[in-house]
Amino acid sequence: MGQVASMPHRCGTYVLELHEWYRKFVEECPSGLITLHEFRQFFSDVTVGENSSEYAEQIFRALDNNGDGIVDFREYVTAISMLAHGTPEDKLKWSFKLYDKDGDGAITRSEMLEIMRAVYKMSVVASLTKVNPMTAEECTNRIFVRLDKDQNAIISLQEFVDGSLGDEWVRQMLECDLSTVEIQKMTKHSHLPARSSRERLFHANT
């Protein structure tokens, strides 16, 4: 997803600010370690509940650099620092890990669609209304058309970075950028979430 983060925003989603995650991390994990189960729990507390579980798992995997199933402060702070102060290329390289689920260095259509569906599910729950939204499939297809330059049905890291830097719509959908994140939050006097101005990302933008 520009995820903390844009992460992938997207197909219309928001993700929390990593600084808020860090605060909760310190409060809820004073040991300095967090498991996937714990991460899913506090991720759901500040987004849209259980509908965020699939996306939370992908974010956790991207944070867990050494693949030991635990995220420590070092891994977490490294991601925060990079997403807050890194170059556009750095942010896109981190975003790439979210979509490259099997870590083989390439994103397949099914891998991207899986993330887009998870993000889309979160957005549907958080949004009040949407007019003619793009589907997760349409979003994935559009991104593949624009990024898969050699048409070999996969997106390499180079294609992901170069294509996103050269296409503002794709970059908005995929880049993790702390400065552009907006969070759906419950209003003080209502059980309904406030509508985010970034819902426009659900719509076709050519």
Swiss-Prot record:
InterPro entries: EF-hand-dom_pair, EF_Hand_1_Ca_BS, EF_hand_dom, Recoverin. Keywords: Calcium, Lipoprotein, Metal-binding, Myristate, Repeat, Sensory transduction, Vision. GO terms for biological process: visual perception. SMART domains: EFh. Retina; inner segments, somata and synaptic terminals of cone receptors. Ca(2+) 2 binds at residues 100, 102, 104, 111. It holds the Pfam family EF-hand_7. A lipid is attached at residue 2 (N-myristoyl glycine). Ca(2+) 1 binds at residues 64, 66, 68, 75. Binds two calcium ions. Does not stimulate guanylyl cyclase (GC) when free calcium ion concentration is low, but inhibits GC when free calcium ions concentration is elevated. This is Guanylyl cyclase inhibitory protein.
